[in-house]
Structures are given as structure tokens and as C-alpha cells.
Amino acid sequence: MSSIIEVKNFTKKYGDFVAVNNISFSVEEGTIFAFLGPNGAGKSTTINTLCTIFEKTAGSLFIDGKDVTDQKSAVRSAIGVVFQDSTLDAKMSIEENLKMHCVFYNIPKREVEERIQFVLELVDLLAERKKPVGALSGGMKRRVEIARGLIHYPKVLFLDEPTTGLDPQTRAHIWAYIIKLQKEKNITIFLTTHYMEEAEICDKIAIIDGGVIVAHDTPYALKKKYTRDKAYISTNNEVALESLLAQYDLNYLKKDSHYRVEAEQLDRLLMVISEHKAHITNLEIKKGTFNDVFLEITGRRIREGI
């Protein structure tokens, strides 16, 4: 699979302040890529440079083989951008907002109707096309934003916090459309999010902190490297349980009669559970989460940092 985004040795300075420091990463075509980081880490600077809004200090950035510095018009034609804050005209209808965007991209008049129908069908809003944007729910507005970002048929869609402020059901619907775009239209999705269950859906994740890439891999690989599953055991015979944990060389933390045991050595933990089952009053296994990954790497929880 070829890379549609290539960032090599990218640096961005503001005077003496280094916002992004010599980072490199790539995004494969047709994948969903999450770019995470605390506030001030360099995340927005990187995205704005990729979208041709900021100028680089050093390095190279390419989208679909086009240099974001020297081929701005070609890059802008290849990307769609959905910002966190709505930029739709609330007084205009869905259709009118999309037509205005077609004008910005010099889309031939003969193609406008076909494109509007196409993108509104993708987000299930064709029947609502005459409604004013101001009368729409938050979830519907996000779908219009996504439709507008697709009207010029980009190869890469940048989504900045696409589901922030939406209820869980609406968030699930928005993600259904995002996955549909990726799978059916082979559009590359580059997104930021502070919902870790969303990050785990992505094919690859990069975490930036202090202006440098501190992790870049699949969600599975990052969780395997930075988290541990844990068992929480309650017992009516603490002496017997502690003896077994020592026998099988398992570390634990105790609070009252509750024990937290690292589940990394699953075979040994299962032996303890089997031999102690008559005394176990409660048992819970908790999988490592991506919040744990972010905390381990950056020292901050994702909801505090992004």
C-alpha cells in the first residue's frame, strides 16, 4: 500500500520557539489515521501546515505526491477539511452551502447537481437538502460539514474533532459515515479526537508531545507495548491468596481485602484463581485502555491533554 501523506524532518519555529521538531511520519492511502497530542504539542501546527495554512521552517511535506509548499493549489484540490467549529452559513440551506463551496473550487456548473446528490446520499441527507442549516441538529450539521468537505472529491479528508459535543448515538452515526467513506470510496481519513474509543478504530495512530512524535503504530501494537491487563480479586482468605501470589511470583497491590494483580503472566494468574476459587468473592479482569497508553507516553490523560 502506497503512502498518500509523507512528512519528512518537518520543523516549525516561531522565532526561537520550536513548535514542531524534526518529525517524520507517513499515512497509507485509504486508511484512517489518528493524530493525537496534548494542547501545545504541535498537533495543530502540523495539520495546518499539511493543509497549506502555515509555512514550514524546514523539512518536506507531501500529499498525493504534491509539495505543500510549492504546489499549494494542487494540494488544496486533493484535500477536504472539516473544522471542529462549524463554518456553515446558518441562514442558507444545505444545498446553498454546498453550491457556494462548488464555486470556491471552480466545479463546472454541469457537475454541481450530480456532486451535491452524491455527497448528500453518502451522509443520508438528500431529502433534507432544502432545510436551512440553522434548523439542523448538531449531528446533522456535522454530516453537512463532511458532505461539503467531499464536494470536490478529495483524496484525503482532514477531520478535526469530528464528534465533539455530540451524544453517543449521533457519534456512532457519524463514525458509520466515516468508515463508509474509507471502505467504499478509498478516501484517506486524517483525524484528531479526544475520544479514545474512536482512536482505537483507526488503522494507525501517531502521538505528538513536546513537538516530537513519541509513538506511531497500530492501536493493537501500542496497547500491547504500553498497557497491562489487570485482575481485581476479592477474597475471604487473604493469607491464602497472598501465599499463592508469592508462590507464583505475581506482583499485586492491596486495598482492604481487594487485590489488583498484573495479568501479564496469564498462565500463572489462572493457576492462582483455580487453586483459590473456593475463597474468591469477586473477580474482574480489566483490559488495558488507550487512555492508559496516552497516560504512559505523555504523563497526561487524553481528556486533560487534547
Regions found by a protein language model. Give the residues of each.
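Conserved ABC ATPase "signature" region
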Residues: K99, V103, R110-E128
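Catalytic Walker B motif of ABC-type/P-loop ATPase nucleotide-binding domains
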Residues: L157-D160
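ABC transporter nucleotide-binding domain
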Residues: A176-A263
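Conserved ABC ATPase signature
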Residues: P132-L136
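Conserved catalytic motifs of ABC-family nucleotide-binding domains
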Residues: Y153
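Conserved ABC transporter NBD signature motif
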Residues: G59-D67, A74-V75
